[in-house]
Amino acid sequence: MGSTQSKHIASAIRNTDMNSDPYEWMHIRSIFPDDYFKLLKSIPLEEVQHMLVNDFNDIDVMSAVCEKFVDAPKNGDIIQSIYAFWQTHGAGYTLKPHEDGPSRIFTFTIYLPDNDDYPEAGTAVYEVNEETREYKTVGMMPYLMNSAMLICPFNKRTWHGVNMLTKPIKRDSIVLVFANHEWAEGKVHYADWKAGVNVNHVI
């Protein structure tokens, strides 16, 4: 049986509409129970990442994610690990258009703002001209309390990033990944401060 928060996460994912332009992406509101989000906000991010790995390491959560994505891998592909890492950024930060590596089956970014004053600090969805490398913002997964962005980098180009932060913001977030490789502490980039666990979920 999953925890209360895991059940809530799975339900929130299933009840969120999918966007499909220019690739599949979701912005999930109320991803946690309100009291649990308040708890996450009250403790250090280093601890939050471990808690979220446990919460998302749930069969119903993983199944809910796989069900939503047409572009998700199928037919015996395996989620072999879940890992998470925290980030804090401020004014002047930007993350240029990029694609996640092929080892990432699904990528969440859990937003942990103090308020809803800076929605533009969320994850931008880009359309990229592969020849000229010019890009434009065609969607936004806004930086709002108790929400998360979700993409499936595995089978499709998923250009995304963060537009330049120009306001005095403290942008806290947790990146949480479902990966197709085993979790081996000390052998993964930034493993000294990531939280991770091996799983075996056949898609």
Provide a role label for each language-model segment:
Residues F85-D100, P153:
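Conserved short histidine dyad/triad with adjacent acidic residue
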Residues D71-F85, P119:
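A short coil-to-beta-strand element that immediately follows conserved catalytic motifs
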Residues N75-I78, P97-G101, N115:
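Short, conserved, surface-exposed binding loops centered on an aromatic residue
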Residues M1-D21, V188-I203:
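Fe(II)/2-oxoglutarate
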Residues T4-H8, A12-N75:
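Non-heme Fe(II)/2-oxoglutarate
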